[in-house]
């Protein structure tokens, strides 16, 4: 509770057990008790839990502006425990604020003052958490400690946001198609008119002779003479085209938002209502400075100042979907965000931040639990529920202790109980820490609706209301929309929006609000000044980001048993099958083709193994896009950490295959030959991994990646020089083998195996007296090891750069 400017020198006790006690806030005289003389304005205190029932003021004075007796927050809202103070829910701090406008003990309980409201839905008690199994406690956020000097001391204070005349236009992607459709429609209409005129003229000639009425004359007494506007009919039947047309003209840009204005006071919890497609998410993206496409106009002020580059440091955004790494625990997920977003803190202080955030979101008992979900490959990891995952997403945003928190549909996909728990977490942030919360929401239950201090309503890209008395406002409109008894106000608002969008007063309502919003809202903002500045936090180095991401990648790899068991056991099985199939080989004439064949198939199989990881790459990219949109790290450290992890895995797979084949099949056994063969197999495996990563990031879809990847791989295998020797390839497309990295790998392992290698030669016939003759048969007699290894490394660099370009430039989160 924040008590402002009370100078009651004769008050020895303020008894907070105000059950069935009336408080007169208009006149505090020199009495020991606060007497309420307001008739019929009873404050039911059944739902106000105060840990300190008696506030003993030994000095008989309450110092001006220095009392912060905050009523603890009750996490269980009882529908029957309502505090009806007939006040508008304008209290941005969710506190019980008593404003003494003069020093003569006269308190003015003016309902228009934002500091004099008791919001019965925003006062809850943190001590009663058993009913909902929530562990939300009164925070003692470690940022307030003196030893954490890297963060601003006022960073836990909410901010005021004013947005004026926000408009947003985006490219009409169907512009060309709509132009073609319009031309076809006009052409068809002209043909129908010409056919109709021809048939009518011939009928007129015949009817004039017989004295019959023409069809136009016979219908004139039934149909109106006004022409039918076909374009209006088409637009009404195609909503998407309606938004991209102006007076029947197709526009290249679609107007999504038009002159949207409003104000959000500090520490308010604001609900953004409206039907689907009304522009709620677009407005949130613009306010959070996350829009990367389209044209934005208008003005956004934070604490009276225009937003700058440091604005994102003080605001956080929670997306509608919980995109989290399934194998990480709750505390590991939050620690990951703390490591990358709070580089100035020591590791001990980061853990303090993580522990406090876990308490704030009520997941203390689940801190060691994994996020859970379906892993790439189909393995299911048991973990958190949907509501708990949503709270973890909120916790990731709270790591930086933001002043402004945006949420897109935080209750989407949750049952009513989990949705209420999530919204209570947000409400506690506004009441206890003063965070300003703005969230879009769709059809909340009544208990959630009453948590909001302010309601904003969007309809067809325009703001039709922003305030705290929405029901009275709707009843004052021309059609007088009255909320029936026993009706969820949120459902009533959405139903009313549908009626307003179809009524004749829609434009009038929108224009009236756009004209008068300054008088209605800006007057409130002048009550208290804001002088808080926005300062940027430090960012961590790319090397540090790489270290943190690499650590997470290896944990994810070893916790995903399906991934590492499948890939490592797959390499073992391939090596074992090859060895069993070809058996023990000798340097005889009969085994020469077997040796070249086993080398070919080894390269071919290692080239195809990375196809098993397509879903893994796409899953990791989804997490990357979500975290990149939040500016947690740069693209390069993520890409390098991913390639490092893959290089380690391919190292193990190639080593297992090479050892098994060399040991069982008895290939040319000397260290240089084995090392070169193994190194080439490893490079081919890594190269294939890189071009699959590049293709998956270019296409963004598993089926397209598989189609393009297999096409490239089959082309590589055909022109590798084994199935068809290079000398026998047609000249028209024989040059393709020079663009084939697998050809260079195959040529190199053949040289390592047969260069100066003595072969057994029978007396009657000897096709290959030694290994050099084998190389000559494959047109590899002049091939050098350095040439093959160098060209393969160049191809690896090419696919590495292509993959990085694709992941950093393509398939970004477009908002």
Swiss-Prot record:
The chain crosses the membrane at residues 568-588, 598-618, 647-667, 675-695, 706-726, 732-752, 788-808. The keyword NADP does not apply. GO terms for cellular component: ATP-binding cassette (ABC) transporter complex; membrane. The lineage of its organism: Eukaryota, Amoebozoa, Evosea, Eumycetozoa, Dictyostelia. Residues 242-485 form the ABC transporter domain. The keyword Transmembrane helix applies. Residues 194-210 have a biased composition (Low complexity). Residues 81-141, 177-249 are annotated as: Disordered. GO terms for molecular function: ABC-type transporter activity; ATP binding; ATP hydrolysis activity; ATPase-coupled transmembrane transporter activity. GO terms for biological process: aggregation involved in sorocarp development; sorocarp morphogenesis; transmembrane transport. Keywords: ATP-binding, Coiled coil, Membrane, Nucleotide-binding, Transmembrane, Transmembrane helix, Transport. This is ABC transporter G family member 7. Residues 562-810 form the ABC transmembrane type-2 domain.
